Amino acid sequence: PIKKGFQGNDAAVVNGSHSTFRIKALQDIGGYAVHNADDVFTALKLYARKWKGVYVPEVLAYGLTPSYWGPNLLQQYRWSNSIFDLFIFRALPYLLRLKMRQIFCFMVMGLYYFLHINFFLLTILPIISVFVNQPPVNLVLFEFLSRFLVIYVLQLLILIGWGQKFLLRPKLERGVWWRSGFLEIVGSVYVFEGFMKALMRRHLLRIKFVTPKDNKGSVSQLYFFIPHILLSVASITAFIYSIYIDINLWQTKGIRIFLLMNIFILLGLTITSTRWFGRLFRRGSG
């Protein structure tokens, strides 16, 4: 549905190798863009030169995605770093030549990874709040949740419910896309790293142009979860410290809920990276 929306706003984007170009169009922009986000950058240059793109919603071939944590997380890191670099340092001169609706579509792409940064900041905020003994905001927690949950549930219903009508393969794709949700949670640490390195202009070397897709479900991916383990330890320490200060202290009562969420979510997802879980998953899927 997002790509169809882009098409309707005259902003169909280039998608990696799944695109066809006019030779004249590429010559007009000086060739295919050289950048880690080369597809988005190329599309941006083409629209700035008033070329038009078309999205064809037909499945011509089925590809693969990484089937285990490591390549998935490194892919998120590489993609986010390149998108941040593109939109922070390079995109503005081209965006100024576009129509407002095209600018909106490209900014939707550019701002997407800030959702991951937001999740990462919300993960560390309760930890910091406990040690400085200050609530992150002045509000009544349960009153806030009673209002926020309504909006959050409505958002999920739109995403999971209404989104089912846009599937290209309904029999295979219908359902709750929980894996992508877990990937966003786990990948938030790597997206934040990609953001910081983009700000420091530390560009990535394209050592691997194609992310490995082979199934290594029985191989431990624990190495990629070291940041999550450290965040879990910090959350446990903050939880214990909040009780040590005063178990009834109002500033830390609500924060403990979020610390417990950190602990269970981060440790739970870390368990999925272990070798025995990979073997169990393969046995169950086989």
Predicted regions and their residues:
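Long helical/loop segments within the catalytic core of UDP-sugar-dependent glycosyltransferases
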Residues: 1-36, 48, 69-111
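Catalytic donor-sugar/metal-binding loop of nucleotide-sugar-dependent glycosyltransferases
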Residues: 34, 43-62
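Membrane-embedded helix bundles of polyisoprenyl
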Residues: 18-20, 60-63
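Short, hydrophobic alpha-helical packing/hinge segments within bilobed ligand-binding/sensory domains
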Residues: 42-43, 72
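Membrane-embedded multi-pass helical conduit in multi-pass membrane proteins
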Residues: 112-204, 222-286
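Membrane-helix boundary/interface segments in integral membrane proteins
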Residues: 201-220
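Transmembrane beta-barrel architecture of outer-membrane proteins
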Residues: 38-40
